Amino acid sequence: MSSSKVLLFYKKTSYDHYFLAGKKRSSTLKKLLAPRDLKRFLDTHQLHYATLAGVEKALRLRGVRYERFCRGKAFDPSGFGLVITVGGDGTFLEAARALKGQFVLGVNSNPYWSVGRFCAGTAHNFSGLLARWIAGRSRVLVLERMQIEVQKKKYPALNDILVSHQSPGAMSRYALHFRGQKEEQRSSGVWISTAAGSTGAIRSAGGRVLPPQSRQLQYKPRELYHGRGSGYHLKGGLIRDGENIRIISLMREGVVYVDGSHVCLPFVFGSTLKVSRSSHPLNVIWR
C-alpha cells in the first residue's frame, strides 16, 4: 500500500437533490410521481448510503485513515495514496479528472440501477478488495487518458469528449486537421474517445470498440451534413500513439464537453483544440 491515507469521494443521490433539498419542490414531485416511482427513488437513496456506510465501516475495521469528500467541488488529491469513489461512473470520472498518479477504486453503490463500468467494487466485495490493497496484492488496470489542449490550457479526459455547438439543435461548424489534411465540416459535432470510452457514445455514432488498454484514440464526426459540395474524407478513424488531431472552431457558441456534461469548455470562433494521448494514465484497482 503506497499510502495509508484514503480519500472517500461520494455523490449525493437524486432523492437528496429532488426531495430533501426543498419542501415545496418535494411536495410537488410527490404529487406528480406514481407511488412505485417514488419508492424507486427512495430505495436507490437508501441503498447508496448503506453502501457508503459499509465502505466506511470496512475502512475503520482495518484501521485505515480516510477523509470524506462530496463530489461537486474542486479537490486536491495530493497526500492520498488511494481514492475510493462511491456512486457510479459519473462519480468515478469526476474524481479521475483530478488524479495524478494516485490509485482509484470505484464502488458502484447501486449495481441494479447505476452504470458502473469503471467500478470494480460493490457493497458485497469491497472488504475483499480493500484487504488485497492493504496487502499489496491488488490487480491494477492501467487505463490510457487523453490530453485536451484548448487555447493553451490542458485538461485530462478518461472517457471521451464532444465538440459541438452549445445548442443540440444547431449545426456544428469546424475545421479538422489530421495527418496533413484539413477539412471544413458541418455536422452535429465530433466525438473523440479513448479506448476506455470506445464502448460509449462514439460506438453509437459508428465508431469502433477498442481493446481496454489500447494506446490509440479515435474520432468520429456525427451526422455529417451532406449538402452540395460536401464530399468529406475525414469521417472518423484511429489516432495512433504519438499523433494528434486539431479542431478549429467556426462557431460563435461552440463548446467542448469533457467526460460528460459537467465540464464544459468554451470553444468560440477561432479557438483551437488539440487532442493527443496523455502521458499520465489512470491506475484503477480492479477485480
Please report, for each region that a protein language model flagged, where it lies by residue:
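A short, gly/pro- and small-residue-rich
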Residues: 96-110
